[in-house]
């Protein structure tokens, strides 16, 4: 009876009538229940869990490889919207080519577009460096403008607005801070190696005497992020490609930044659409030698760019038109109480007049009575083209001043001192330095620069030209003198030759006596 019952329990073979698991003290465990749950009728259990995992893995793959119809349609709608927005942006970009310049800016930062900048049309963003000039045609949206780099051969494109540049800068600073912290954690924990990671290559590693906390606190404060981003981009290759789209100019010289007062510099400064031309040198304005040479150059410019240039005299002290003064009402009282020749209202009026003249996209030359040094205008919004008339030899300048008579000779020391101050300026402070001995060379140098600037500000694609410029040129053509132009050219070149060629022929005039150069100069 017992044997029959055991035989009826299942199809076990004679050698395995009773499984050994029955005598296992842990048949009620969790694993045993799972295993029994997938046991087949033939008793095979080796592939139970494998087959189950295979089925579940296959179902997951089939789920991910088959997106729903709603997801597909949503992706198609997004792509269609993107293409339509890009088409409209291209159409607006094409229309902007013939639009007049709304305003101009000078850049304080550099920009190199990257794929993550969300440019309205990929590949049409404009790359620029610090101190470049941009002509803005119109505002596309809150993040992008339409304009062009003032350089020959550059076409219109998308320019990031100040809001966009600030957001890119903040994102860049955040990534740089994270990169610094991660690099400091991955490095050695010793004080010397920590100093190397925090300070980088620009500052030496501080000694292990307690300065580590100072450098660490300095690292956490974003004092030098804008100045160090170029070097940090080179040190971390992966960070350079992703966050190096906005750059600031490197600092001039070595500075200790611990006590530096942080001041946010705007990415752009609004400047005249055409940079005004200002002559300085060879000495002080108001004295005969300087006024004589500058007047000869103004006459030359008036003839060469007839119909394309406006020459105007400025008597107000435009060096007072600093951005920090005009934007700060508390400083107005200080300026008004000082013994200045011009009031701030008069200065502001002159600045507005210069901006208005530049809107016509004509060349603008300023005969400024009070400007004798480029530093006087460095903090203004004029961004002028500084032309330096340079007399290399102080002896030549002395001879010129003495030849003008006693009224000029008694101010010899003042004029020589002003000339020396100009000579001490680095060449970067001037746009053009006219130090040629021959008249033709000096005039050709000046003409080449201004012609190149004219082409940079008037690209061939900007047709029709500015209507204000058309009216001005038409008026100038109607009012032109019927006298032959060649006579005027001969007069201007002759007057310049009498002055500029005198510098090179000073030794000959000294051997022949001092009356010859004086007679030539009075012929001016």
Curated annotation (Swiss-Prot):
Q: Which UniProt keywords apply?
A: Calcium, Calcium channel, Calcium transport, Cell membrane, Ion channel, Ion transport, Membrane, Phosphoprotein, SH3 domain, Transport, Voltage-gated channel
Modification sites for Phosphoserine: 44, 47, 73, 186, 193
Signal peptide extent: none
Entry's transmembrane regions: none
Q: What GO cellular-component annotations does this UniProt entry give?
A: L-type voltage-gated calcium channel complex; T-tubule
Lineage: superkingdom: Eukaryota
Q: Name one GO molecular function term.
A: voltage-gated calcium channel activity
Q: How is it modified after translation?
A: The N-terminus is blocked.
Q: Where is the composition biased (Polar residues)?
A: 54-71, 235-247
Keyword Cell membrane part of the UniProt annotation: yes
Physiological role: Regulatory subunit of L-type calcium channels. Regulates the activity of L-type calcium channels that contain CACNA1A as pore-forming subunit. Regulates the activity of L-type calcium channels that contain CACNA1C as pore-forming subunit and increases the presence of the channel complex at the cell membrane. Required for functional expression L-type calcium channels that contain CACNA1D as pore-forming subunit. Regulates the activity of L-type calcium channels that contain CACNA1B as pore-forming subunit.
Which protein is depicted? Voltage-dependent L-type calcium channel subunit beta-1
Q: Which organism is it from?
A: Oryctolagus cuniculus
